[in-house]
């Protein structure tokens, strides 16, 4: 074929692509569609979004376009919701219509499929309901909300305090030890075991989980999700989710070992055994979500999400204690008055410790570790704040805009525990406190996270006073965004009280 013949073909292809592009963006011209930056042909707004610092980028777009604005990521329509009113209207008022998740094509690399969607990214439907119900009931049966699980956490808190004491007041980074303690609680629930803090496989698993988290954001990831045909190019597909794949491989080894010790005649000791029991019941049912492929995804969901979010919040808590020693002293005084320095903290103590409870909540608000939540998708046309959002639109809930809303919080950009105290010093929780999101897809691990945060935090401050190491500069209170917002690396000294 000569060059002359290729020119008309190229023109035809270009016209076809432009027509397809116009079809995908035609809703922008619909009445009451949210405003937003003008998308480029083919790319949409991919070049307008800084995926390395998305929360800041969205804040700038909010100032320009308002609380409800639209984006076009290649051919994927996206609406970003900002502020308490818009977020609650979408997730609570229209809870049934916004409970779906958008397809995430790159998760096929990890083994996601119609029968293996896990819990967190599962489409809204029978499989999600089945797994959500199973996860909640199993965690409850394993002791969530009961004294038995509380004892697991307090035992692990004692191990964590012993590990802190081993540093003998010398400077160290606390993040690794916090990861290990929180992960052991999750490992006990999912796999019925705890690991020693120096176990090589445990260290490898935690390292892969942390590195995998960084793969949850970035320009290439967004491009591959927006244009999934590019996943057929091995050179591109091989560059994403490498650590998450390695994490699942490591988890597969643990699950294989665990299955060898499972006795179906005995009551389940952990979530994995409960899942295996459901698999036995579901044999012969091709529609069931209880299968080998989904087991690894469900356990990975609970393990990685349950570990990273809570340990990151605790890391923020210790950072804020060394930056605000006056707050630290008030927490310790309340611990001494209510618990003392010998007895282990209990969840029953929380009702008598309003200041400590306020501090923990303010750590969550200020740390703002999941600023953009997890994406939702509309399953039918809805209206939010007067704007019409069509069926099939991806929704991003800017939780950071709620947790740091200047119209709600007295000092939104400062650490201020009094946000959660009334004039009499009683604990109060404003409606805008949404670190676990809201609606039907709110975090199912919230009760466990609240227990761990209280017991680990109070145990550490009961035993240690924390400070900035002598001669070191004052650490930054600015976070680092990589889907989660983690504290900038810092060291502290833990001096026994």
From Swiss-Prot:
Pathway-wise, it operates in: Cofactor metabolism; retinol metabolism; Lipid metabolism; fatty acid metabolism; Steroid metabolism; cholesterol metabolism
Q: Where in the cell is it found?
A: Endoplasmic reticulum membrane; Microsome membrane
* Keyword Cytoplasm annotated: no
Kindly list the positions annotated as binding heme. 443
Q: Name one Pfam family in it.
A: p450
Which metal ions or organic cofactors does this protein require, according to UniProt?
Answer: heme
Per the UniProt entry, the effect of residue 169 to R is: In allele CYP2D6*14; poor debrisquone metabolism
Question: Could you tell me which CDD domains the record lists for this protein?
Answer: CYP2D (cd20663)
Q: What is the effect of changing residue 410 to K?
A: In allele CYP2D6*27
User: Can you tell me which residues the record assigns to a coiled coil?
Assistant: none
Q: Which GO terms describe its biological process?
A: alkaloid catabolic process; alkaloid metabolic process; arachidonate metabolic process; cholesterol metabolic process; coumarin metabolic process; estrogen metabolic process; isoquinoline alkaloid metabolic process; long-chain fatty acid biosynthetic process
- Chief site of localization: endoplasmic reticulum
First and last residue of the signal peptide: none
Q: What is its EC number?
A: 1.14.14.-
Consequence of changing residue 463 to D = In allele CYP2D6*98
Superkingdom of origin organism:
Eukaryota
Tell me what induces its expression: By pregnancy.
In UniProt terms, what is the effect of altering residue 237 to S? Answer: In allele CYP2D6*33
**Any single Gene Ontology cellular-component annotation:** intracellular membrane-bounded organelle
In the UniProt annotation, what is the result of changing residue 34 to S?
Answer: In allele CYP2D6*10 and allele CYP2D6*14; poor debrisquone metabolism
Tell me the protein family, please. Belongs to the cytochrome P450 family.
* Annotated protein name in UniProt: Cytochrome P450 2D6
Protein encoded by which gene:
CYP2D6
């Amino acid at each position: 074929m000569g060059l002359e013949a290729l020119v008309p073909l190229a023109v035809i292809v270009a016209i076809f692509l432009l027509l397809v592009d116009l079809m995908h963006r035609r809703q922008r011209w619909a009445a009451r569609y949210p405003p937003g930056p003008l998308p480029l042909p083919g790319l949409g707004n991919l070049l307008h979004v800084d995926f390395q610092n998305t929360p800041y980028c969205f804040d700038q777009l909010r100032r320009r376009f308002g609380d409800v604005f639209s984006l076009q990521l290649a051919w994927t329509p996206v609406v970003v919701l900002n502020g308490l009113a818009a977020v609650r209207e979408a997730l609570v008022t229209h809870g049934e219509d916004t409970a779906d998740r958008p397809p995430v094509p790159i998760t096929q690399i990890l083994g996601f499929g119609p029968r293996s969607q896990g819990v967190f990214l599962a489409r809204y439907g029978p499989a999600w309901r089945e797994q959500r119900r199973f996860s909640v009931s199993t965690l409850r049966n394993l002791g969530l909300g009961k004294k038995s699980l509380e004892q697991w956490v307090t035992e692990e808190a004692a191990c964590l305090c012993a590990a802190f004491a081993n540093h003998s007041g010398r400077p160290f980074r606390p993040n690794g030890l916090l990861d290990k303690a929180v992960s052991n609680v999750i490992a006990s629930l999912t796999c019925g075991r705890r690991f020693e803090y120096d176990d090589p496989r445990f260290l490898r698993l935690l390292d892969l989980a942390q590195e995998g988290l960084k793969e949850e954001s970035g320009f290439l990831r967004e491009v591959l999700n927006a244009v999934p045909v590019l996943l057929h190019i091995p050179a591109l597909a091989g560059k994403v989710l490498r650590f998450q794949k390695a994490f699942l491989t490591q988890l597969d080894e643990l699950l294989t070992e665990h299955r060898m010790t499972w006795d179906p005649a005995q009551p389940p000791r952990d979530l994995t055994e409960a899942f295996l029991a459901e698999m036995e019941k579901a044999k012969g049912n091709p529609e069931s979500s209880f299968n080998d492929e989904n087991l690894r995804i469900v356990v990975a969901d609970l393990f990685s999400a349950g570990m990273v979010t809570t340990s990151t919040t605790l890391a923020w808590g210790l950072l804020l204690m060394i930056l605000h020693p006056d707050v630290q002293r008030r927490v310790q005084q309340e611990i001494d008055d209510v618990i003392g320095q010998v007895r282990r903290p209990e969840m029953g103590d929380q009702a008598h410790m309003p200041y400590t409870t306020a501090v923990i909540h303010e750590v969550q608000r200020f740390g703002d570790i999941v600023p953009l939540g997890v994406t939702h998708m509309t399953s039918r046309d809805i209206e939010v704040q007067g704007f019409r959002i069509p069926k099939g639109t991806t929704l991003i809930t800017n939780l950071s805009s709620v947790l740091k809303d200047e119209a709600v919080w007295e000092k939104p950009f400062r650490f201020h525990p009094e946000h959660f105290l009334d004039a009499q010093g009683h604990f109060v929780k404003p409606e805008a406190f949404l670190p676990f999101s809201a609606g039907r897809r709110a975090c199912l691990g919230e009760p466990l996270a609240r227990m761990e945060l209280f017991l680990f935090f109070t145990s550490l401050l009961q035993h240690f006073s924390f400070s900035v190491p002598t001669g070191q500069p004052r650490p930054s209170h600015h976070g680092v965004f990589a889907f989660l917002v983690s504290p900038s690396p810092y060291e502290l000294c833990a001096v026994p009280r």
